[in-house]
Design a protein with these regions (language model features):
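Short alpha-helical segments and helix-capping/turn motifs at coil-helix boundaries
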Residues: 29-31, 47, 67-72, 138-145
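Iron-sulfur-associated redox domains of electron-transfer enzymes in respiratory
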Residues: 93-215
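Iron-sulfur cluster-binding cysteine motifs and their immediate structural context
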Residues: 41-63, 77-104
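Conserved structured core elements
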Residues: 36, 40, 82, 136-137, ...
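Ferredoxin-type iron-sulfur electron-transfer modules and their immediate structural context
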Residues: 1-45, 49-56
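Short Fe-S-cluster ligation motifs
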Residues: 65-87, 119-132, 137
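Aromatic/His-enriched, Gly/Pro-containing loop or helix-boundary segments
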Residues: 25, 31-34, 60-77
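Intrinsically disordered, low-complexity coil segments
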Residues: 14-18, 66-79, 163-173, 207-208
């Protein structure tokens, strides 16, 4: 009789491919394809300051500042920098990986809004915030609470440009702003019907020494 022999096969988890996508892919797949939302996340995340942005009507899109490899490629990207594609919310399919990381599963076909436990209707308990806010003033109420309870130092919000028409009233053009108190949050409450790349207020926040920021 031969002794029982059991074969043991060593299994290894396949390594994930290294993320190597850079400005070149972002330019082709998002910026020039119509997917770009103008959020300016790529601009703020760039450690080399080579991505520009014009917060003006007809613009609202990032562009490359260095022309060494042409406007559709990046010297730093060719050397391995991937910050811009990692920051972009429209670059390829990231929701599946995020769902797996946060919830341990992928969303079902009927979960178009994502995975959630409950859907709750809310409003600000402060009547003044409720009245001037949009859809109940929830976001304004959260930001005010965070500022007053030392959870954050400031918030990157959307405001409106000042008296651009000379009539004593604010214009309709949205403007990225930094809010550090209740009054500044309320000054930016309500809806905006034009682009506002709130992340463009980040440099101002850093200059003011604000590290804990809400966006």
């Amino acid at each position: 009789m031969y002794p029982h022999v059991m074969a043991v096969t060593e299994t290894t988890t396949p390594k994930k491919n290294r993320w190597s996508f850079q400005w070149k892919e972002l330019y082709d797949e998002v910026i020039t394809s119509g997917l770009c939302t103008g959020c300016a996340g790529c601009v703020i995340s760039c450690p080399h300051d080579v991505i520009g942005y014009k917060h003006e009507p007809g613009q609202y899109k990032p562009f490359h500042l260095e022309e060494e490899l042409g406007l559709s490629n990046c010297v730093h990207g060719e050397k391995g920098c991937t910050s811009c594609t990692r920051a972009c919310p429209r670059f390829r399919d990231w929701e599946t990986e995020a769902d797996e990381h946060l919830f341990g599963r992928s969303r079902e076909p009927d979960e178009m809004s994502g995975i959630f436990k409950d859907v709750i209707l809310t409003r600000a308990s402060d009547d003044f915030v409720y009245e001037i806010g949009q859809d109940g003033g929830l976001v304004s109420a959260i930001l005010i609470w965070c500022l007053e309870n030392n959870v954050v130092d400031g918030a990157l919000i959307s405001g409106l440009e000042g008296d651009i028409n000379g009539d004593g009233e604010s214009g309709w053009k949205a403007k990225p702003m930094v809010a550090t108190n209740r009054d500044e949050v309320l000054a930016g409450s309500g809806s905006r019907y034009t682009y506002s790349a709130n992340t463009m207020a980040y440099p101002e926040a850093k200059e003011r020494g604000l590290d804990r920021l809400a966006l």
